[in-house]
């Protein structure tokens, strides 16, 4: 199946992009660039895996298996909602990459802002009723559910919404191809969740702080990643706030009222 996918993509690329040519020549600089790109992607994925596994271990060591089960439930709900975001990002990504590759930076910036607000508003529209009725949803799904399952699930959804704002930034960095600084900063910040949560639990705070710490780190990471993106791509912070973040803020404030 993978071979078929590769073949279809190759045929499409050959037809769509006339400048592409098959060649037997090996360019070491190109291979080095591809390996670097892949390596930093793997590095970032490893950091997220470490964060997820480490969080479960820390929770289990302080609060036992019941809270760990509640944490697992919250992760399942968050992953289910996040799948919708992945589908939307998949629809945006080819257009974003194509616009940047062609040097159409005006369209690239518009796609960046559109991806930010569309994915957030769509996810928020799904998340809001779920947050409001989470007890009923868990009761239908599980019957009896562990302590802290409700609060952990709500906080996981909120964390996912904040984290989703960073996904378009990541897609921009991927389109540009300069991943090193982005992945190092993101990975270090994400991994900080584990020791900071451990400190919170050591001083007697409840399990909800695993996600409260995560939300704080996600916000800090968003700011850091915007600074990194600004170094490699020309966009204005004010324009980003006005065209991407403010529509998300309006949707968040007005939706519960409506």
Model-based region annotation:
Residues 7-52, 91, 95-110, 231-246:
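Interhelical loop/hinge segments that connect adjacent transmembrane helices in multipass membrane
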Residues 157-189, 231-233:
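Membrane-interface junctions at transmembrane-helix termini in multi-pass inner-membrane proteins
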Residues 30-41, 58-79, 103, 107-111, ...:
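Interfacial/gating helices of multi-pass transporter permease domains
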Residues 74, 78-116, 170-175:
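Helix-loop junctions and terminal segments of transmembrane helices
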Residues 113, 121, 131-161, 233:
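Interfacial segments at transmembrane-helix termini and the short loops linking adjacent helices
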Residues 29-40, 119, 152, 214-258:
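Membrane-interface "helix-start" segments
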Residues 1-16, 37, 187-192, 206-228, ...:
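Hydrophobic alpha-helical transmembrane segments
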Residues 4, 39-42, 55-57, 69-89, ...:
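Alpha-helical transmembrane segments of polytopic membrane transporters and translocases
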